């Protein structure tokens, strides 16, 4: 009795935790970064007016350039694809046979002994597949690294908790600073190597995992 009760408790704990599962991700980079600590060594003075270490353009807004800066990504992704395939094949054949006439003997009889046949095979196959996706959202990501050419590696995650679960929007990619608009805004279509995903851990996803766990434990319970 105690073993059965403990097994039921274990099953119940898995069922409750299934709803809080964090879905897997295709974004394999850190999702945020903190600004680098200021150096205690004074940067070299490489000019009387222009200082590369503290350069900020005079006639433009403050733009993301350093690790820890933020950029707003406007996600507007649309994709559609279609594929059609078809094949056809046919084959026909015929055969005739007759009995030989041996030295003219039994000619009248063998002329009547003949056979013929024909066959036809036809095959045709057609298929079509279409797919269409539309993803529109806005999120702010963090610069996690700066490449040697000045391009920015950005990544971030946005979580939205709803009544029956949580939604996860994750993003990563490489941003060319010249494509960043006023207000530190860039379109997702201008981000290189972009990885965009939308996942949930709603009760539907949790129910699928819970169902598998329940079947496993119920199969070993002495009920």
Curated annotation (Swiss-Prot):
- What InterPro entries would the database entry show? Flag_Lring
Gene Ontology terms, MF aspect: cytoskeletal motor activity
Location relative to the cell = Cell outer membrane; Bacterial flagellum basal body
GO annotation, biological process: bacterial-type flagellum-dependent cell motility
UniProt xrefs under Pfam families = FlgH
Q: Tell me the superkingdom of the source.
A: Bacteria
Q: Where is the lipid attached (N-palmitoyl cysteine)?
A: 19
**Keywords of this protein's UniProt record, alphabetized?**
Bacterial flagellum, Cell outer membrane, Lipoprotein, Membrane, Palmitate, Signal
Provide the topology term for how it sits in the membrane: Lipid-anchor
The record's annotation in PROSITE patterns points to: PROKAR_LIPOPROTEIN
Cellular component per GO, a single term: cell outer membrane
Major localization class: membrane
Signal sequence extent? 1-18
- Lipid attachment of type S-diacylglycerol cysteine occurs at which residues? 19
Subunit-structure text: The basal body constitutes a major portion of the flagellar organelle and consists of four rings (L,P,S, and M) mounted on a central rod.
The record describes the protein's role as:
Assembles around the rod to form the L-ring and probably protects the motor/basal body from shearing forces during rotation.
Give the record's family classification. Belongs to the FlgH family.
Give the protein name, as stated in the record. Answer: Flagellar L-ring protein
Q: Which organism is it from?
A: Herminiimonas arsenicoxydans
Its taxonomic path starts at: Bacteria, Pseudomonadati, Pseudomonadota, Betaproteobacteria, Burkholderiales
What is the primary gene name for this protein? flgH
